[in-house]
Amino acid sequence: MKAIVYTKYGPPEVLQLKEVEKPTPKDNEILIKNHATSVNYGDISTRNFKNIPLRDFHMPLPLLLPTRIAFGLRKPRKRILGSEFAGEIEEVGKNVKLFEKGDQVFGYLSMNMGAYAQYICISEDARVATKPANMNYEEAAVVPYGVIMALSLLRKVNIQPGQKVLVNGASGGIGSAAIQLAKYYGAEVTGVCGTPRLEFVRSLGADQVIDYTREDFTASSETYDLIFDILGKGSFSRCKGSLKENGCYLLASFKMKKLFQMLWTKIRGGKRVICALAFDKSEDLIFIKELVEAGKIKSIIDRSYPMEQAAEAHRYYEEGQHRGKVVITLDHNNKT
């Protein structure tokens, strides 16, 4: 089979299309003929892991060395990137009960990665579910990551109808999911983004949109129950004046300083910092599938690239001008 492989850390050009061995499912595994995957922040940072600046390492610094060892100090241990996928089950192990050959599925591999390949072999208990009936493979492949991350945080703070939510970084994968989920839960949502993306964020359902190049939301007298800072580029000290008395500052990352702030604000009470990573389950994907089929969550695709142009897809993502998700399609016409 064909896969997008990288054997050294570096720029997008390290991604190469190569022939690799097709996996064989074990008794409790399913073999998925993969049709689409995506480009996420995790793919970019993992590909360039050896050279990633400390300021962009979204984990506590004591975890830097163990993480480097896990991923590979000098070269990648896992040569195939990609965490999101959508495809069709081609073969099932003899003990598989949840799926059948021919089922159309989508899912999330998290840090295991491996979705930049024509075939994926995973346990039936992994983060995989039947694909939403109203989405094609490309649309389904870009849903899991952002929605799972946003859902994890919003559940953690028990979001309530009528609450005021601000999403800073509203046009990316997690931000666009956070807006749609907050609206589903009945919140009043404000999205913060740059000038070219204002209409895009409005189209997601945001009640208000702030252009950060013209207005600083922290300088306003407006206050919010929840402020969702997607990659933690702001700060709690800067944003806490914009939080209501018991408001929460939400982060989809957990640097050491943020963890200390989370612990301290939990002890102190009042305004709180909440850091969370998604310990997602297949049940979450089933819930997401239901939201998609009910029209509450839509897939936002900016560009789609064939697997031969994976480097170009990564380069475009790194430019930071995408609105929504970047897709990589996996052609099977000439597979081996």
Please report, for each region that a protein language model flagged, where it lies by residue:
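C-terminal capping/lid region of NAD(P)-dependent oxidoreductase domains
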Residues: K296-I300, E312-T336
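Short, well-ordered loop/turn sites that connect or cap secondary structure elements
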Residues: F99-E100, I159, L243
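Mid-domain Rossmann-like dinucleotide-binding core that forms the NAD(H)/NADP(H) cofactor-binding site
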Residues: A140-D211
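Glycine-rich beta-strand-centered segment in the early N-terminal region that forms part
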Residues: E21-S38, I52-M111
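N-terminal Rossmann-like NAD(P) cofactor-binding module of classical short-chain dehydrogenase/reductase
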Residues: F106, I210, I227-F228, L250
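A short acidic, Gly/Pro-enriched loop at the edge of an enzyme's catalytic core
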Residues: T218-L226
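Glycine-rich phosphate-binding loop and adjacent beta-alpha segment
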Residues: I230-I297, T329-T336
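A structural motif shared across PLP-dependent enzymes of the aminotransferase-like
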Residues: M111-E124
